[in-house]
Amino acid sequence: YTTLFRSTGENSELSMNSVVLPKANEIADTRTWLVHGEKNCLSRQLHKSIAMDAGKAVFNGMITVTPQALKTDGQMTNNNLLLGDKAQIDTKPQLEIYADDVKCSHGATVGRIDDEQLFYLRSRGIALSEARKMIIHAFAAELTESLENSVIKTHVLERINQRLSEV
């Protein structure tokens, strides 16, 4: 999916979060472009991918700060979890800044389930498959816990559980 947002008013705020769970040979292609066009704007983006089997997640994100968008504060993060030997992640967070007095950052992480976390949970008597699910849910929790609408939160958690049960 592609999301484009342009802040056209001073002091505008945006929070944009997403989670994708490609599996088998699926490709989840996420593209965001946020243009800060006025002063004192704030944005927070958090995008997470959990690539299973031979699934592939692609993230291309851009924050553009125009010359008049002084005092802008923009942040974009893309965290990725690889769950299959053939799973792939391509991530490209970008900043395009044309103003001097701004605070913007971007970052990306790609990793697998930590063996030490698995060992800790297994040493407490938790089955391997359940321990993996707990770690994956913890990875996604930063997004799911921030959902204020209980109907949407329930739907997202059910969808994550459904995708994980197929692995």
Question: Where do the protein language model's features map onto the residues?
Answer:
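Conserved beta-strand/loop scaffold segments within soluble protein domains that form the structured core
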Residues: 2-126, 140, 147-167
